Amino acid sequence: MSIGSFVRFDRRYGLVIFALGIWIWIGYSIYAHTSKKIIKATIIQSSKPVRHIDDRIYPQKKETLWFDTLYFPKGNELRHPKYGYLGYRQNFVAFFDTDIDVPKDEFVNFVIYSDDGFRLTIDKQKIMEYPKDRPFQKSEKVVRLAKGKHHIHIKYFQGYGQLGIVGYYAVGMSAKEAQKARKYLIGKSSSDLKFLEH
């Protein structure tokens, strides 16, 4: 084998390794940014102002997306850290739906930070709400859930200005224990509560 053929072989080998590296990187990027179907989000843009959780919506655009967590931090546009900016800034509602499996009867503390308002229901029963405009603030409620499967539905609205909604939960054998327990993002399973993938 001459030096020239060795150099050609080396370049080809290098190109194959480079192409393989790019292929692996693209595959990982797609996998890392593919949403687990944990939380179904239906977002409706209204052509008229929204100032209250029960205001009539005049649909201008409707979109259904899937997310792994209820984490849309405070900002000027609806954004998820994993999936980026979603193009919603004002006058919209979002419906978040997910199912959970509770392994035993337990108390669950739900903590919702929102700007503007929201309503949380479990199995069609209203648990807590803040129905009007507000800056990014916290609402908290402890509920007792029986062993088994439950459906969580969160309605969120944004009027104008800053926006965001972030949800956490914590589990305990008593209400007081649930308030002090470690908090997890809604959508992230723990040993005490499992979010079901669709």
Describe the role of every protein-language-model region.
Residues 3-103, 113-198:
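Extracellular/secretory pathway-exposed regions associated with glycan biology
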